[in-house]
Amino acid sequence: MKLVFYGAGNMAQAIFTGIINSNNLDPNDIYLTNKSNEAALKDFAEQLGVNYSYDDEALLKDADYVFLGTKPHDFEALADRIKDSITDSNRFISIMAGLSIDYIREQLNTNNPLARIMPNTNAQVGHSVTGISFSNNFGPKAKDEVNELINAFGSVIEVSEDHLHQVTAITGSGPAFLYHVFEQYVKAGTQLGLEKDQVEESIRNLIIGTSKMIERSDLSMEQLRKNITSKGGTTQAGLDALSQYDLVAVFEDCLSAAVNRSVELSNTDD
């Protein structure tokens, strides 16, 4: 299976590094290219043991999956450059936010199978939650192959293209929202008199430990919370204080704003 990556930004790097580390593919079957900075691309490709090239015809020849990882505003120029080199074997996987399947196909002047994926930065540690939507002509075998590729850097959830906006908000932007919550937790902790570095290190380990509890347990998060909440205890007192605030409404506002912005960005390709 030959894979080609157009674009070598942070997200693209996380994805193809995860795929390489999974040992499911021969690195010799992976090809990288970017818009410029050949020296950096050469060094990175050699570090990973993969190929690099700026020859679009050679890249696309016999390529099974072509990842489109350029910045959205650079895509039209890329499409204009490669559209005459596209072959029937090429299936496209876009990680470009906001660009619809129809728009990408129109710019590439092709009806080849195309999938849109929305990973998050946790792909860098093999734990992305990636939303995916397939064009109607993406066959079952090809879907299985793509899902296997994505599982190399996390988990996958298949949704309709319209629902990628919600996935973008909940999991795509989710790490940043959680980081923000943890930031506030650190600030609040320092107000209790402990040193900031003590609080930050404690909360880092708290997050890691809690994540492992969630991962290893079959219980819901609600039940896990109840299991450590004693009536009349300190945890109950803190939860009672939290219950004075409508946290659901706060997160609904947060997620709705992200969904609306995703929709706005997608409308720019009309």
Language-model regions: role of each:
Residues 1-54, 127-128, 190-191:
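NAD(P)+-binding Rossmann beta1-loop-alpha1 motif at the extreme N-terminus of oxidoreductases
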Residues 26-30, 88-90, 112, 197-198:
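Short acidic capping loops at alpha-helix termini that bridge into adjacent secondary structure
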Residues 30, 59, 195-202, 224:
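Small-residue helix-packing motif on alpha-helices
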Residues 37, 47-48, 56-132:
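Rossmann-like NAD(P)(H) cofactor-binding subdomain of soluble oxidoreductases
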Residues 51-58, 157-159:
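Short acidic-hydrophobic, aromatic-tinged amphipathic segments that line or gate anion-handling sites
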Residues 103-113, 129-166, 179-216, 261:
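Internal alpha-helical scaffold of NAD(P)-dependent oxidoreductase catalytic cores
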Residues 204, 208-270:
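NAD(P)-dependent Rossmann-like dehydrogenase/reductase catalytic/cofactor-binding core
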